[in-house]
């Protein structure tokens, strides 16, 4: 009866510096589900991520929704500027920028929550099986 399932990468050490790129490209077999791709960035020793980690278990994530094909592989480009800052699936409105030079972790999740105040139309309860083939940059 939970509202989401997710998987996270290990925390990157050293941090990923992707500042010479424009975005991510994901190849995924998602079986028609709408997934969320989340990215965490480090904002310094006493930065925003640490502030939000103290306020919530999920912390600050930069998120994009990914609609997948029912059959076969979905290839989707996620420009850095399309990522939205969120905490606990809620968009936040702070004057912060995505830090492509200090990426600390990736997350892929399937949630019953979609855009703020809405349910995810691609959510299906029950067993889930998807194949993340690759995450690359362009």
Predicted regions and their residues:
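Beta-rich carbohydrate-recognition modules and glycan-binding surfaces
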Residues: 1-138
């Amino acid at each position: 009866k939970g509202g989401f399932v997710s998987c996270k990468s290990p925390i990157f050490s050293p941090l990923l510096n992707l500042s010479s790129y424009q975005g991510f490209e994901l190849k995924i077999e998602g079986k028609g589900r709408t997934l969320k791709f989340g990215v965490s960035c480090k904002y310094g020793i006493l930065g925003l991520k640490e502030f939000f980690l103290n306020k919530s278990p999920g912390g600050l994530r930069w998120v994009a929704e990914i609609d997948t094909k029912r059959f076969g592989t979905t290839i989707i480009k996620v420009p850095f500027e399309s990522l939205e800052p969120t905490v606990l699936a809620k968009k936040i409105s702070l004057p912060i920028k995505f830090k492509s030079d200090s990426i600390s972790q990736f997350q892929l999740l399937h949630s019953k929550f979609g855009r703020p105040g809405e349910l995810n139309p691609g959510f299906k309860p029950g067993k889930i099986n998807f194949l993340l083939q690759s995450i690359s940059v362009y």
